Amino acid sequence: MTTPTAPAHEADAERRHEHRFQVSESIARLVMRTTANNLPLSRDDRPYQWSTTTYCDTLSWSIFRAAEKGSAMQLRIREYHRTRPREVLNPGTAWIEFKDDEQDTSLKERFGVPMDVARSFLRGSTTLPDPEHGLAERAVRLLRDGARPVAVTQYNRLAYNSLDSSLRITADHNLMYFALPWESRGDAGETPSPLGSLLSMEPDVIVEMKWYGDLPHWAVDLHAYLKENTREERPSKFIVAMRWLLGETDGTRKPKKK
């Protein structure tokens, strides 16, 4: 079955650089103050709106294993709320997101649909248009391989975006990682799924810079400042969430030695 109406659609025009930094609240305030002086507030992200992202993986954790090697195709469902929900896959608008990560670059495409359509897509009962980069087709293959929701992140995001979308800078506060109960992974029902155990809560702020082409001079200086004030680049939220879920971390920076 195909969705009867055309879903809202957003896609990156090309691969973009993507760097993440874990910083203190004071550094984050300085960074975002500088950003606000140079970029407009994103029209799609309201300040400190709750974002809930449900990540999928297969029984063999193939997406996570590929991501740790630097190349993976993420499949996730994103929801936006004014207050933090205690459940996921709630009624309303959902964004089905496909994100192809390759080292420090990414390519993202997403479709805004009613949540019942998103649930149907996860069951393999609904298809989506595949107009841009072939990401939807790759996501369908992951679902055929058994990909199901396994982990969730929730956070408040403050985002600034250039008018031509060539540069985006975000700060994520109150970031939390959750497991998703096993019964939430199957095809049962259309009711929201309760969050599982809280795996970890981030004490710091995650700042992300995403851009095409060359950075403007002020952003080059900002990027250098962030690098100087962090020990190492931050892994993706998906990688961190999966490390916590599988017990493969002593924290968010360093996996356990095997």
Q: What are these language model-derived features?
A:
Residues 1-258:
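Phosphate-end processing signature that detects enzymes handling 5′-triphosphorylated RNA
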